[in-house]
Amino acid sequence: MIYVTGDCHGNFRRFQSDYFPEQANMTKDDTVIITGDFGGVWFGDSRDDETLDWLERLPFTLVFVCGNHENYDALERYPVDDWHCGKVHRIRPHVLHLTRGQIFELEGHRFFTMGGAKSHDIEDGILEPDAPDFERRLTMLQRKPRARYRVNHISWWAQELPSDEEYAEARRSLDAVGWQVDYIITHCAPTSIALMGSRHNEADRLTDFLQEVRERAKYHYWLFGHYHDNKAIDEKHILLWEQIVRII
């Protein structure tokens, strides 16, 4: 069995048995995929352990692509391992980060993964904690109603968008299978879908790359998160947030 759900932001209440009773019939051979903004690796130290250990005790294997609200510095410290023909960061034995540009073979189906998204809650800037005026700027923003800012390497990371090498890895992976997969798992959507949503959405390098994938690849379903809604865009593209849906 394979299920997919959307952004968690470190809140995993949906995986309690009262909310996800289907897990009673699942084993570690079954998989639940989170479409980004996992948030379980946030502090990068022992403060994450209680939550991660609880996730490891769940009866299924939990995997996720990265979103734009992840501690990338901490994620990158985990060992890279091979899993079902692709590369993962192994957070716990059965809690895995599906890295970008990979194709995983799960239950006889190909899954292409390309996590990440551009943050749009940074209109008031990204603060540098080592800057001499950091405290002054932070105090000013804290006094501003509904200020939208982040702090570099504390609440925002440049790695939220893929590197040149990750784009190249994605192209190599897709070339190797003739751009034919069964499922695509991303955090944000292709440009044509992203622009259908909020006025804050705009095209960027990642959404444009995903638009190319949409136009070139052959696939059955594309599941993504980021936009905090549960919605079928059309017969192939599914936006997920709190819902947990079975796909296999």
Label the model's feature ranges.
Residues M1-Y3, Q102-T113, Y183, D234-I238:
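Beta-strand-turn-beta hairpins that frame and shape the catalytic cleft
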Residues P93, E107-H200:
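Active-site-proximal loop/helix segment associated with metal-binding centers of metalloenzymes
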Residues I2-V4, I33-I34, I184, L223:
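Residue-level marker for buried hydrophobic side chains located in beta-strands
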Residues A158-I248:
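Internal alpha/beta domain cores that form substrate/cofactor-binding pockets in large enzymes
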Residues T5, N11-L106, R199, A203-Q211, ...:
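Core catalytic region of metal-dependent phosphoesterases/phosphodiesterases
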Residues C8-H9, F38-G39, N68-N71, A117-K118, ...:
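Catalytic metal-binding/acid-base residues of hydrolase active sites
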Residues M1-V4, C8-R14, F134, A147:
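Acidic, histidine-bearing metal-coordination/catalytic regions of metal-dependent phosphoesterases
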Residues F43, D73, I122, A194-L195, ...:
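Generic domain-boundary/flexible-linker signal
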